[in-house]
Regions:
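Carbohydrate-active catalytic/glycan-binding domains of CAZyme proteins
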Residues: 12-556
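N-terminal export signals
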Residues: 1-11
Length: 556
């Protein structure tokens, strides 16, 4: 398993009294929709399950590279590599050095919005938007694995979702979503802009021009035209954009022109992808589809990666927006992904050249993932909330254990709590860990499921006089409530903790004696972890935490 090192302590240990040791962490996914064996030559959707939104893709020779948005999590913008579009391996992150960004004080759904990856003349380029933390930027590298350059800011470019296009003559252009010219006509009225881009100075040059005002039909008041990408095929320039907002009305539209500057005419069959016209209440729904990026294969076929979500009820999903893959059909010079009313398939025929036996774990399908904390650096799946300002995670001081140094910044803060999270990738899952009891009072530690600072669970343990108590706290809004607690004996044996999910219901268990799991709270309504209730753009993450105890009844 590839490893990364930006979260690990090297030389600045915190006070030993604040240290809590974790022996292992395990995540198991058991979604019924993934239980059916794959037919030979087929793959599963999503190809990246869990909080992997806003995919962008490029091809270099026979290899494909893909990036996703991460918002206020760190490291930022994972970079994946594949040889067949189905099996992906994370090879790096565009932002993994602490000095590159500062997310302090930001909500979890601010920070790193959608990025775009392209390759030109032996170099990779990623452009993106660090919302409320610098704005639009460009970074580059000779290898997708990095190291990536420092971020070069683009102060003259407003809006979000920048994307680079390289024409056949080598000219570079920067597209982005921005305000329309003049006064917006309605809420959600945006425009797609384009400007030449100088790769030597990493800055746009020359005049900017609106390529698309509002959407494909301004009279219908389309909202949130965004995620623009430009492609060239058979003498046409194709402009593809997301329209309708990243929710149930999400869609993808396409336009084309003989001239890179336009004018661009819409396809006769827009949108080329949406799920908004499907029946509500259908079994195993996939919704919110859009934010497409296209890529061609060496044999001339085209494929689309895009985001979509898997609700467990209504528009509630705790897994966030995920990355899906579908083939593109070209008809009469226009691309099409799905016809109107067609559902996104969970199983589809794999691209040409994919091995007959497909194993997409641990990024799709049902699987068990375990970290025994045996390596000196964290596995790439681990994320922190915002950029660490101190070294609170340590895999070196005690080999085979993860030591977290408790911090006063808790899960409800907009700072950097001592919390390592991995993405919840299934609606039916079990996450568990084993830890030693904190050596002193005033420290809570355990296992957390986090959506944002006002939506999380913490299943933990704290010293209480001569004993200890196991508790489960729930944050729903601005108040933290203890759902259940029970006293346990103080022993030297590790305490096991478990959070399990069944759609919108989560259960919490512990084992303090080695004699088996005991339920602390069962079937609690966890819909506050869904985007529909919590707001924002991220999915849930789950993992170990340690914090210095504040007043437990404090209300923010």
């Amino acid at each position: 398993m590839a490893l990364a090192a930006p979260l690990v302590a090297h030389a600045q240990p915190a006070a030993p009294k604040q240290a809590v040791a974790f022996d292992w962490f395990e995540y198991r996914g058991d979604d019924p929709v993934f239980a059916t064996p794959l037919p030979a030559g087929h793959y599963r959707n999503p190809i990246l399950a869990g909080f992997y939104p806003d995919p962008s893709i490029t091809r270099v020779g026979e290899r494909y590279y893909l990036v996703n948005s991460t918002f206020a999590y760190f490291p930022a913008i994972p970079v994946f590599e594949s040889t067949d579009l189905v099996h992906w391996t994370q090879v790096g992150n565009v932002v993994e050095r602490r000095e590159q960004l500062d997310y302090d004080g930001l909500g979890v759904s601010r920070g790193m919005f959608a990025a775009s990856i392209r390759h030109h003349a032996g170099r990779f380029y990623v452009v993106g938007t660090a919302v409320d933390s610098g704005g639009n930027f460009i970074a580059s590298a000779t290898s997708a694995a990095g190291p990536w350059s420092t971020l070069s800011w683009l102060p003259g470019v407003d809006g979000i979702d920048p994307s680079l296009f390289f024409d056949t003559d080598g000219s570079a252009y920067l597209l982005n979503n921005g305000p329309p010219e003049g006064t917006p006509l309605y809420e959600g009225h945006r425009a797609i802009w384009m400007q030449r881009f100088d790769l030597a100075t990493h800055q746009p040059v020359g005049p900017r021009k609106v390529l698309l005002n509002g959407g494909v039909d301004l009279a219908s008041k389309p909202i949130w035209i965004e995620g623009p990408h430009l492609y060239q095929r058979d003498g046409w320039y194709y402009l593809s954009c997301a329209e309708g907002g990243t929710g149930p009305q999400h869609s993808q539209v396409v336009l084309r022109s003989r001239n890179v500057w336009g004018p661009y005419a819409p396809a006769p069959h827009n949108p080329i992808l949406t799920q908004r016209d499907l029946r509500a209440g259908r079994a195993q729904p996939i919704s919110n589809a859009g934010h497409v990026d296209l890529v061609d294969t060496p044999d001339g076929r085209w494929w689309a990666v895009f985001l979509a979500s898997r609700p467990y009820a209504d528009d509630r999903y705790n897994t966030g927006r995920e990355t899906f893959l579908l083939p593109v059909q070209w008809r009469d010079g226009w691309p099409s992904i799905l016809p109107p009313g067609a559902p996104i398939p969970y199983v589809a025929k794999a691209p040409h050249g994919t091995p007959a036996r497909i194993d997409q774990t641990p990024l799709s399908g049902n699987f068990t993932w375990r970290d025994g904390f045996d390596a000196p650096t964290p596995q790439r799946e681990w994320l922190s909330l915002r950029v660490p300002k101190r070294d609170w995670a340590d895999l070196r001081a005690r080999p085979g254990w993860l030591t977290l140094h408790a911090t006063p910044q808790g899960l409800a803060s907009t700072g950097n709590p001592a919390f390592l999270g991995r993405r919840q990738q299934h609606t039916h899952f079990t996450a568990s860990t084993a830890l030693e009891l904190p050596a002193h009072a005033g420290i809570s530690a355990g296992l957390a499921a986090v959506q944002n600072s006002n939506a999380w669970y913490a299943l933990g343990v704290r010293r209480d006089g001569d004993g200890a108590e196991v508790f489960v706290d729930k944050r729903d809004g601005t108040r933290t409530t203890t759902l259940a607690r029970t006293r346990i004996p103080v022993t030297t044996a590790p305490l096991r903790l478990q959070i399990s999910g069944d759609g919108g219901r989560y259960s919490f268990a512990f084992d303090a004696t080695g004699h088996g799991w005991q339920w602390l709270q069962r079937h609690d309504d966890a819909s506050m972890l869904s985007t529909a209730q919590a707001g924002g753009f991220v999915g849930s993450t789950i993992g170990p935490f340690a914090q210095l105890d504040p007043d437990r009844t404090k209300e923010d």
